[in-house]
Amino acid sequence: MRIPLFILTFLFTFFSLATTPVSADSGVLYTDAVTYCAEAKAVIVDEFDITYHRSNGSVTFSFSLASVEPNLNTSVNLYINAYGIQIINQTLELCDLLQGVICPLPQVNFTGYGTYPIPAEYLSKIPSIAYTVPNIEAYARVQLIRVENNEVAACLQATLANGKTAHQKGVIWASAIFTLVAFLVAIWHTASGTSTSPIQYRWFDILFIFQVAAASGLLHLNYPLVYTNFVQNFHWALGLFYSSSMQSSISKMREKTGGSMDSTAYSEVQYINRKLSPYNVYMDDNGILSSPESLAAFFKESALSKRSLEHFAKRATIPSVLAQNMTTDINTGLPVYTNTLRIPEANAYDTIWFVFLALIGIFIAFHVLLFGMVLLFDRMGRNRSHLGWAARLRRMWWPFCVGNSLRLCLIGFFPIWIFAFWQFHIGDSGLSIFWAVFGILLTLVPLATAFLLSLLRARRISSTSPEINSLYTSFRYFHSIGVLYRQYRQKFHYFWFTPFVLAMIARAGFIAFGPASAWAQVIGNLVVEFIVLVALLACRPHKDKKGDWLGAFLSICRLIAIGLLIAFIPDMNVKPIPRAVIAFVIIVFYGVPVVFLFVGFLWNIGYGYLWCKHSTRVEDGLEVERFSPTSSNSSVPPPMMKNVDAATFVSSDGAAASRGSLSMGGAGASGAGLAGGAAAAGTGLGRRSSLIEPVGDNVYEASASSADGALSPPPVTAYNPYGKEEIGYPYDPQDSRLAYEQAAMGRGGVNGPGSPTDEKQWSRRY
């Protein structure tokens, strides 16, 4: 189906205005970067700049060149292309221009500059969209051709810009600071020990959306220029930071360990001639200027006179520049992405690896300083309730450090796996390959270990709350590995690893190992994201509906953004303007989730402190607070928790039996019952016995509901929520409370004297 051109133009203009700030420099077109497009042989060009000012319809230009051959007569071919549309492609004789001053070319270095008005007939041909769209895909090429044999004597190419770009320092800093603050706030809430704020796991959603956006620019696709500039805003999320000294050290390291790949990074303008380039040519031969005569007339009107060339002066010889069209054969995607950041593709993984090592050093230093502060405030605040957080954090310090270490692995996981796989793909330095293997192990082993330990722990039955997953009752697990699974329901505690971590591995593999097939890269990532979305919709793993909705929404946005990348596959042959429109749509699908996450971040900052202060879910640590002495501000364990000597321990069943014997058989029977209970305790503890027993006044108050409890059901074979078979009475919270009250009041057990089967006797005793 063909989309009407006016609709594409409207969408193109709308999204460009929505993503580009208004500036005082609007209405200016200029050469952004200039380079040789062929080896300089007969003519050396040192400077070539052109700027068009829309406000006064004039052009200012400057150039510096020299001929190295005598009697060099050339013609000039001027070619201008914008969004694949050929605007100018004309060849003119230099002897017919500028009154023959440069025919033949002077064999001296000379410079020229000036400002000249452009006739109105040409101004009307320039579309207004050229001044509003960021990163316009336009370039000019100037070739000097020998008159005698039509060989190219010199070739220059220059990208054109209007001062608007999707690559903004403000976006880079804002996104990086947003992620950093979210991470620090997450650590702050975790350090409190009692916070239930979702920011403790939402921080990774913020980081991951930026990592996915940056990684989408690493594929072997024909990207629009605006999209390549957009994804470069998030190079920090992949750990790609440029440092000249670090790049020099990495290059030397690679050379000494078998590396042979080029260590030079090339600028973006040098990729103009590539097959997969935003400047490639597609369309139509209808130019703004229709004939050589009309173009010659323009030069004649604004020609330089001999008098105006008096300022040309001899200069020192300009050294020859090597041919730079060697970048023509470089693959698009990851190599171009890193080279644009001045990082050679061969140095890409080592750059990320050393940045990650620096992050580990910062992590260690941060925790050392924090521990010193905790010790200081703990000593200062033993009698001050507002400093109770220090005492809590000191007791949970090692689980806290383990949890933050797992977070650090998540930060580096996706970029390290992408570029480690890429290092395997290109080979080169043996030491770089070793670092790649080490990086994979350093990020995978801790997360895989945490995953296996959580699976084993989840199969254990808690003695205090057998109906609840042990991961959500264990203090050590909840405050360490819990930073990964606490956002999920007990049944889906593993969801952080399967499918999310495994999905990151699959994405990295398709990106790094698929540069030979753009279809494999895009479809592979699309299938992975689709599987994640289906898992989210089918399982609804989050502990609340808000989490399920947000998780599915983020996945849908990623799925649409990845799916739209199909338009950039070279085989699709999508024309430049539709590709640019699609690029703006993809930018929207990455921008909208960031807005939602930012609003949620503002809400979650005070969550657990200013509002929603109390835990209401097991997944929020409700059971951990009930059975942990660190759940309060006091450094003294509450009275209901008491360590009991196993040698003299009397279980609840034994105590209840003894009290029942006392009530039914008098003092003599009481002694026998007590002895029987002690003997039972000495023989061994029951399956549900615990060395932590409620003592003192911390017992349930008798209630009418418990007094009027129904008869206990017959024993059945049941399975607990974690797959273990149990024979006996199925657990029910109301029945447990009733049994507890019965034991506290001296009742004799389920079927013994004083049981619910003897209602009259129970009524008299109650």
Swiss-Prot record:
Its main location: endoplasmic reticulum. Residues 1-24 form the signal peptide. InterPro entries: TRP_C, TRP_Flc/Pkd2-like, TRP_N. GO terms for biological process: fungal-type cell wall biogenesis; transmembrane transport. Disulfide bonds: none annotated. Residues 704-766 are annotated as: Disordered. Its EC number is 7.-.-.-. Disruption phenotype: Results in cytosolic calcium elevation and increased nuclear content of calcineurin-dependent transcription factor crz1. Affects cell wall integrity and leads to abnormal distribution of chitin. Sensitizes the cells to the combination of osmotic and temperature shock, affects vacuolar fusion, and interruption of autophagy. Finally, results also in a significant loss of virulence in both the invertebrate and mammalian infection models. Belongs to the transient receptor potential (TRP) ion channel family. This is TRP-like ion channel protein flc1. It comes from Cryptococcus neoformans var. grubii serotype A (strain H99 / ATCC 208821 / CBS 10515 / FGSC 9487). The gene is flc1.
